[in-house]
């Protein structure tokens, strides 16, 4: 429950963060399909004997090359099979957290028997769409998720419709937190971060706890491309400086290594993405530790980072050709800049420089290489902060950057929402040809 004395707008900010910053086990696109399969299996009479699934092109893109936690296998078919046979239908993005060794073995056997199929839904106007249909003999259950990774819109079985999400909004119902957030500004977000009672935002410290554990696991060197562990090793060899900049990159990329490599630890996600959550969290944590920040300062910096990342990403399609680690890192830049000097001017300059730097990075599907993009984005964020501290930034005379940071963000998001749609189609076409 909220403190009734809190500013109503601040309450919506907090709700937005609570809705968009959640624990997630495994890359969220395969996990969305696993959840659909798990919920369908829960509705089915008898054990699952066969799984059919259909996904949007964007979800297929983000599911082709990523490891499903605990399985050592990549791709959507194993996610669908394990969700159906070992998923917890009530666990949301942590649907696979209780999957047993037996369930994993059964899922692999179902896959080997050719009883699992995943296809692109055609036609499909939705960017995020997953549908799983599970069978037991002639009996079946089908679940459809649309728009958000856990947004179930339809449940149906051989006996009829079980649930359909109502599209209409009841009269007098409050606007969603994200709708409210779309009308705010970075300046208003900063005012909130500076003035909100610590007790109201203490919960955001959980993002540091979860993502730091994932980072520590990544530093073991056995996950994904082990970028974090490799860079740490190069520090020991004297090929890379042991400094704050290196620590930011190493600890952030290590968390992504573990995440994309299939570690069975949850990430605290942001905007439906574990890597975005990692990118919005770890650079801020490292800088906070460097300055000896207490829990309250860390919580305020993390709240600024996560809320800014949500604010920017809310102006984008849920999935697109733009690598959203870059927009999450803009949030991290805000959080790090706040820790150093707290000025709005520094924060806005850092974000503007980020937009002038890494805006062209494409999303070519979830995979181990996401950790490369996470490390690049984290490095760019700290560089932008250092520039801003010296009163230097990419100016409104250059490229898509405008004189006003809000317009710069709008320009970036317009590119991703419109012009990069053809880029997305080309990426999906290339990836589909490789999968044949």
Curated annotation (Swiss-Prot):
InterPro entries: Ser_deHydtase-like_asu, UPF0597
Disruption phenotype: Slightly increased sensitivity to excess L-cysteine, the effect is more pronounced in M9 minimal medium. Cells produce about 9% of wild-type levels of hydrogen sulfide in the presence of excess cysteine.
Gene Ontology BP terms: cysteine catabolic process; L-cysteine catabolic process to pyruvate; response to L-cysteine
Transmembrane feature ranges: none
Inducing stimuli: Transcription induced by L-cysteine (in vivo), under control of DecR. Member of the dlsT(yhaO)-yhaM operon.
One GO MF term attached to the UniProt entry: L-cysteine desulfhydrase activity
Short name of one Pfam family: SDH_alpha
Family listed: Belongs to the UPF0597 family.
Job description of the protein: Plays a role in L-cysteine detoxification; it has been speculated to be a cysteine desulfhydrase.
Protein name, as recorded: UPF0597 protein YhaM
Organism, scientific name: Escherichia coli (strain K12)
Name of encoding gene: yhaM
């Amino acid at each position: 429950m909220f403190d009734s004395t809190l500013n109503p707008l601040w309450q919506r900010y907090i709700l937005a963060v609570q809705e968009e910053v959640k624990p997630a086990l495994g890359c969220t696109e395969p996990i969305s399909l696993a959840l659909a399969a798990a919920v369908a299996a829960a509705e089915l009479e008898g054990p699952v004997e066969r799984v059919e699934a259909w996904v949007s092109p964007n979800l297929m893109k983000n599911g082709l090359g990523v490891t499903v936690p605990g399985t050592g296998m990549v791709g959507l078919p194993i996610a669908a099979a394990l969700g159906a046979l070992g998923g917890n239908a009530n666990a949301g993005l942590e649907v696979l957290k209780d999957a047993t060794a037996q369930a994993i073995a059964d899922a692999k056997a179902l896959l080997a028997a050719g009883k699992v199929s995943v296809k692109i839904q055609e036609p499909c106007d939705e960017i995020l769409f997953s549908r799983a249909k599970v069978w037991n003999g002639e009996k079946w259950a089908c679940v459809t998720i649309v728009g958000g990774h856990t947004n179930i819109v339809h449940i149906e079985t051989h006996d009829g419709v079980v649930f359909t999400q109502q599209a209409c909004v009841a009269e007098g119902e409050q606007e969603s937190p994200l709708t409210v957030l779309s009308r705010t500004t970075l300046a208003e977000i900063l005012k909130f971060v500076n003035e909100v009672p610590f007790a109201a935002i203490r919960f955001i410290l959980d993002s540091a706890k979860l993502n730091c554990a994932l980072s520590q696991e990544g530093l073991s060197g056995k996950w994904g491309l082990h970028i974090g562990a490799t860079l740490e090793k190069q520090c020991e060899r004297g090929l890379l400086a042991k400094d704050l900049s290196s620590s930011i990159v190493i600890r952030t990329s290590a968390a992504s290594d573990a995440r994309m490599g299939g570690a069975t630890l949850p990430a605290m996600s942001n905007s439906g993405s574990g890597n975005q959550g990692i990118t919005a969290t770890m650079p801020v944590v490292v800088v906070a530790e460097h300055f000896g920040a207490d829990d309250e300062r860390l919580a305020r910096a993390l709240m600024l980072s996560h809320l800014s990342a949500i604010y920017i990403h809310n102006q984008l399609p849920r999935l697109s050709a733009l690598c959203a680690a870059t927009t999450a890192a803009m949030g991290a830049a805000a959080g790090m800049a706040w820790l150093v000097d707290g000025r709005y001017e520094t924060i806005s300059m850092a974000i503007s420089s980020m937009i002038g730097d890494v805006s062209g990075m494409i999303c070519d599907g979830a995979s181990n290489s996401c950790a490369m993009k996470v490390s690049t984005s984290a490095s760019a964020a700290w560089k932008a902060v250092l520039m801003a501290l010296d009163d230097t930034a990419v100016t409104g005379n250059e490229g898509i950057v405008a004189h006003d940071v809000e317009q710069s963000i709008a320009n970036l998001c317009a590119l991703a929402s419109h012009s990069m749609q053809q880029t997305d189609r080309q990426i999906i076409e290339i990836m589909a040809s490789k999968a044949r």
